[in-house]
Curated annotation (Swiss-Prot):
Keywords: Cytoplasm, Methyltransferase, rRNA processing, S-adenosyl-L-methionine, Transferase. It is found in: Cytoplasm. The gene is rlmF. Belongs to the methyltransferase superfamily. METTL16/RlmF family. It catalyses: adenosine(1618) in 23S rRNA + S-adenosyl-L-methionine = N(6)-methyladenosine(1618) in 23S rRNA + S-adenosyl-L-homocysteine + H(+). GO terms for molecular function: 23S rRNA (adenine(1618)-N(6))-methyltransferase activity. This is Ribosomal RNA large subunit methyltransferase F. PANTHER family: RNA N6-ADENOSINE-METHYLTRANSFERASE METTL16, SAM-DEPENDENT METHYLTRANSFERASE.
Length: 327
């Protein structure tokens, strides 16, 4: 018997919302953004709905837009990145940090621990240094960022120095591409959090294909317009690694065991939903505790981060008593 179909339109799925503390809910106020960063005015266009926007397929427009967001919302006066390096979406990066703050608050009677006593390690901080900038401005946390790319680190150092954040953001070079924590964490160091935005793809060709797909989804692929030329030499470590995201986060899980007593909460973004369950199973087999996958959403995009610890309840309580500021 044929299946009945309804003539009634399906209700649209509710649009995912940002974290309640995220400063970027609602439409962007372009007049205010332009007031904060006048050069943004050169890139503002009207979208098909007659609203002010920018051309998100134009790398220069996106770069200046990010500069305006960081200046207006976080007081970051000086920010730039070299051509060809990732220009991250600020709202999504902020959401990850707010989610991590909630994790700490859940262990601290609902109070987010703030200030430089809270140390955070950003694995692969990149040329943009986005997590340390936002995390320090929002919560006063002290960051250490690591990267294997000398050009990316030089860019990040320029940003940190220009904004006089040298005392709260430290940058370290990772000399071995197969290592994440080793070579960065000293034996006597402890961190409340680690965070990471892993490479997504398994090869340069896959990364290039993904970028082509991105521009098509933006509706910018047409015969009269060339796609942006991507500099994969500079972006390689940001976009792909052998085995892709699944192999990267598995390596992170394995390596985290050696630093079990030095980190309160490990975490990593996981972009591909299919990589979550294998990572969680691996962590549990390694003896990790409180293994969680926490969902995030920005508009139509859904993502999540996985977090874990090796500290039992008594060790966590002792850590908080010793290190966290009392409210």
């Amino acid at each position: 018997m044929p299946r009945k179909t309804s003539s009634q339109p399906r209700p649209a799925e509710p649009k995912a919302v940002l974290h309640p503390r995220n400063r970027h809910s609602g439409r962007y106020d372009f007049p205010k953004l332009i007031a904060a960063c006048p050069e943004l005015g050169e890139y503002v266009i009207l979208n098909p709905y007659g609203k002010q926007s920018i051309d998100f397929a134009n790398p220069d427009a996106v770069r200046v837009f990010n500069r305006a967001l960081l200046r207006q919302f976080y007081g970051i006066q000086h920010w730039d990145i070299p051509a060809g390096y990732l220009c991250p979406p600020v709202p999504g990066r902020a959401d990850y940090l707010h989610g991590l703050a909630d994790l700490l608050a859940a262990d601290n009677a609902g109070v987010i621990p703030r200030g430089a006593a809270v140390r955070v390690l950003d694995i692969g901080t990149g040329a943009n240094c986005i997590y340390p900038l936002i995390g320090h401005r929002e919560y006063g946390w002290r960051f250490t960022g690591s990267d294997i790319d000398a050009t990316a680190l030089a860019s990040a150092r320029t940003i940190v120095a220009a904004n006089r954040l040298d005392k709260v953001i430290e940058l370290r070079r990772q000399d071995t591409s197969t290592q994440l924590f080793k070579g960065i964490l000293a034996a006597d160091e402890r961190f409340e959090l680690t965070l990471c935005n892993p490479p997504f793809h398994a090869s340069q060709a896959e990364a290039a294909s993904g970028s082509q797909r991105k521009w098509r989804n933006l509706g910018k692929l047409d015969p009269s317009r060339k796609l942006p030329k991507l500099n994969f030499g500079g972006q390689a470590a940001e976009l792909w690694c052998e085995g892709g995201e699944a192999a990267f986060v598995a390596r992170m899980a394995d390596e985290s065991v050696a630093y079990a007593k030095q980190v309160y909460r490990f975490s990593t973004l996981v972009s591909k939903g299919g990589n979550v369950a294998p990572l969680m199973v691996r962590l549990q087999r390694l003896g990790a505790l409180q293994v969680q996958a926490l969902d995030m959403a920005q508009g139509q995009k859904k993502s999540r981060f996985v977090t874990w610890t090796f500290l039992d309840a008594a060790e966590q309580a002792a850590w908080r008593t010793e290190r966290w500021p009392r409210s």
